[in-house]
Design a protein with these regions (language model features):
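A glycine-rich phosphate-binding loop feature that marks nucleotide/adenosyl-phosphate handling sites
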Residues: 152-155, 234-236, 289-300, 338-349, ...
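Preference for bulky hydrophobic residues occupying beta-strand positions
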Residues: 8, 115, 148, 295-297, ...
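Gly/Gly-Pro- and Ser/Thr-rich, intrinsically disordered tail segments characteristic of DNA damage-repair
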Residues: 1-232, 281, 369, 377-420
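DNA-contacting surface of Y-family translesion DNA polymerases
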Residues: 188, 196-338, 353
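Acidic, metal-coordinating catalytic segment for phosphate/diphosphate chemistry
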Residues: 311-420
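Short, charged/polar surface micro-motifs in flexible loops or helix N-caps
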Residues: 11-13, 42-45, 300-304, 348-351
Length: 420
């Protein structure tokens, strides 16, 4: 029996959430109704466009382009800086809302998720009707709109949600691929990017249908395993398994009980750095990327709390794990003395699998004030080389042979460590 999978995507999420928040705080102008963007620094006019309104799009403004270029296209463009903490909170509320219907939910990023409708179809009826109900409830409850794509497999549901926007429901059943998807430009297929387009065009591939009907062995010869993957995407071949938090439970983690209670942010972050080193090293040794990280705190009165968030791009980088862990810690910690700190990564995938890049690989925020020497900036290759160099030294001379300067603590903080 075929499954029924929803892909739900917030329309221009960062701009929508900023607009809703400003309206709640008394702003008279809706950012979604004027030429506006999210991104950059208004004073310096540096950075890139992270999200744009429909009217900004009419001026030719595109996501990912430099702010200065966008302003040349539209002189009266309104620019709003990003608020990542607020976006994560809106995302959390939305996911909790979906869970009132079903626990079978797989969050892909802050603004999109898969939902397995199959187990609840008998309760709510025809899927398109329920999807319309769902998107209308979101609009009324939260004030922003979503698109819902529906199919038997995840890749087609995701493609369907990218059809006409905003505030729409679309189906892309396997029987509809030839009619709805194959005529589209190949650039619109999920995971086909700028680097692969020239190679595809050299092979005479211009539409998704061209790709779908190409001999996959030829694609593999030119694009290696990636060629096979996009051929499968073009033919609607993919997983129908929605990996909820429960099914994606396997992960890599580490926690440490502290010799003395920690009462300041700086010391806590040094401990988080050491934990990030340990966890990321084990991920790299095992050949995994992590899609999610959680931070756990146990206070001196032995009460516990934890907070988790997805990475924008799956990673095994020490810097990225540390950066997000620090953000989670800052949101979670209530100021009480800390007895134990822990980090756990989950939603593991083989590091050889293709990874969808995020705009945030180009523009890290500056929320984390420590360790900027390796968390600030976009140079992914330098981060990977640093991690590899440290891994090689530890493998040859032992774990204590090299540490980052900022993790040198006068007195050893850790009493005991526990791996997961």
């Amino acid at each position: 029996m075929s499954k029924i999978i929803f892909h739900i995507d917030v329309n221009s999420a960062f701009l929508s959430w900023s607009a809703v928040e400003k309206l709640k705080n008394g702003n008279q102008v809706d950012l979604r109704e004027i030429p506006s963007i999210i991104g950059g620094d208004e004073a310096s006019r540096h950075g890139i466009v992270l999200a744009k309104s429909v009217s900004a799009k009419r001026y030719g403004v595109t996501t990912g382009e430099p702010i200065a270029q966008a302003l040349r296209k539209c002189a009266n463009l309104v620019m709003e800086p990003p608020n990542h903490k607020m976006y994560r909170e809106y995302s959390r509320r939305l996911m909790e809302y979906f869970k009132t219907y079903t626990p079978d939910l797989e969050q892909l990023s802050v603004d999109e998720c898969f939902l397995d409708y199959t187990p609840i179809a008998h309760l709510y009826g025809e899927p398109v009707a329920f999807a319309n109900r769902l998107k209308n409830e979101i609009k009324e409850t939260f004030g922003f709109t979503v698109n819902v794509g529906i199919s038997e497999v995840k890749i087609l549901a995701k493609m369907a949600s990218d059809f006409e926007k905003p505030d729409k429901v679309h189906t892309l059943w396997k029987s509809e691929i030839r009619q709805k998807m194959w005529p589209l430009p190949v650039s619109e297929l999920y995971m086909v990017g700028k680097s692969s387009l020239p190679k595809l065009r050299n092979l005479g591939i211009h539409t998704i249908g061209d790709l779908a009907q190409m001999n996959p062995e030829i694609l593999e010869a030119h694009l290696k395993s990636f060629g096979k993957l996009i051929w499968q995407n073009a033919n609607g071949i993919g997983s129908d398994v929605v990996e909820s938090e429960e099914t994606a439970a396997k992960g890599v983690g580490n926690s440490t009980t502290l010799r003395e209670d920690v009462t300041d942010v700086q010391t806590a972050k040094k401990v988080l750095l050491e934990l990030s080193e340990s966890v990321s090293g084990r991920l790299r040794k095992s050949g995994f990327f992590a899609g999610n990280v959680a931070v756990e705190i146990k206070y001196s009165d032995f009460t516990k709390c934890s907070h988790q968030a997805p990475f924008l791009t799956p990673t095994n980088s020490t810097g990225k794990i540390y950066e997000l862990s620090c953000r989670l810690f800052e949101e979670l910690w209530n100021g009480a003395p800390i007895r134990l700190l822990g980090i756990r990564t989950s939603k593991l995938q083989d590091e050889n699998e293709p990874v969808q890049m995020s705009l945030f690989d180009l523009d890290f925020s500056k929320e984390v004030k420590t360790e900027q020497s390796f968390t600030k900036g976009p140079n992914r290759e330098k981060l990977e080389k640093l991690d590899k160099a440290m891994d090689d030294i530890k493998k040859r001379f032992g774990d204590g042979a090299i540490v980052r300067g900022s993790s040198l603590i006068k007195e050893k903080q850790s009493l005991s460590a526990q791996e997961e």
